[in-house]
From Swiss-Prot:
The record marks S34, L35, L39, L40, C49, L50, L51, H52, T77, L78 as: Cleavage. One of its GO terms (cellular component) is plasma membrane. InterPro entries: TNF, TNF_alpha, TNF_CS, TNF_dom, Tumour_necrosis_fac-like_dom. Residues 1-35 are cytoplasmic. Homotrimer. Interacts with SPPL2B. The chain crosses the membrane at residues 36-56. The modification Phosphoserine is found at S2. Disulfide bonds join C146-C178. Residues 89-234 form the THD domain. Cytokine that binds to TNFRSF1A/TNFR1 and TNFRSF1B/TNFBR. It is mainly secreted by macrophages and can induce cell death of certain tumor cell lines. It is potent pyrogen causing fever by direct action or by stimulation of interleukin-1 secretion and is implicated in the induction of cachexia, Under certain conditions it can stimulate cell proliferation and induce cell differentiation. Induces insulin resistance in adipocytes via inhibition of insulin-induced IRS1 tyrosine phosphorylation and insulin-induced glucose uptake. This is Tumor necrosis factor.
């Protein structure tokens, strides 16, 4: 039924009611019915327009995929980035437990790697590209009892840059495992001293980085992964 026919029916009904109604009460009833009829027609017309222009009601099937057009590219980007391997230089080398009296770094191990241009040359990591790098290293010392003289343990990360010839210390730490004051207190008890170094630095292509200690005889190789050295490009 069209809107024009609905309005025509309402007008005819109002005319009939006006003929049948008599006096003031009839006029008031006719006015109320007319107002109710007008609101009913207006509501029906509004509902018809909303349905006709698709403002309300179920969406068309061809419009559903468009609702996700702004979401799909983001999801696809996240999925593709998670699959794309990083091309940034990275290295993680571990100490050789078979090298007695020295700290020798190895890359050919299951828990070590050299990737995207980083090289291990003469026990030093060679930087392949300019940029910011996270440099880190850890060593673990152990001993049995304390000697008469204090034991000083040092761990240092140095840089030999291509722009200037002298070696410069980037990170350094020193520890003493023995703090007893009398021989009676210096019993033959085992001690352990870890030293961790880490920081972010601007490096140049060709820079050589080394991680060194002063007391290699105290290194603890009992467990794999306790002594390591690495860089990560940021």
């Amino acid at each position: 039924m069209s809107t024009e026919s609905m309005i025509r029916d309402v007008e005819l009904a109002e005319e009939e009611l006006a003929k049948k109604a008599g006096g003031p009460q009839g006029s008031r009833r006719c006015l109320c019915l007319s107002l109710f009829s007008f609101l009913l027609v207006a509501g029906a017309t509004t509902l018809f327009c909303l349905l006709h222009f698709g403002v309300i009601g179920p969406q068309r099937e061809e419009q559903l995929p468009n609702a996700f057009q702004s979401i799909n590219p983001l999801a696809q980007t996240l999925r593709s980035s998670s699959r794309t391997p990083s091309d940034k230089p990275v290295a993680h080398v571990v100490a050789n437990p078979q090298a007695e009296g020295q700290l020798q770094w190895l890359s050919g191990r299951a828990n070590a790697l050299l990737a995207n241009g980083v090289k291990l040359t003469d026990n030093q990591l060679v930087v392949p590209l300019d940029g910011l790098y996270l440099i880190y290293s850890q060593v673990l010392f152990k001993g049995q009892g304390c000697p008469s003289t204090h034991v000083l343990l040092t761990h240092t990360i140095s840089r030999l840059a291509v722009s200037y010839p002298s070696k410069v210390n980037l990170l350094s730490a020193i520890k003493s495992p023995c703090h007893t004051e009398s021989p009676e207190q210096a019993e033959a008890k085992p001690w352990y001293e870890p030293i961790y170094l880490g920081g972010v630095f601007q490096l140049e292509k060709g820079d050589q980085l080394s991680a060194e200690i002063n007391q290699p005889n105290y290194l603890d190789f009992a467990e794999s992964g306790q002594v390591y050295f690495g860089i990560i490009a940021l």
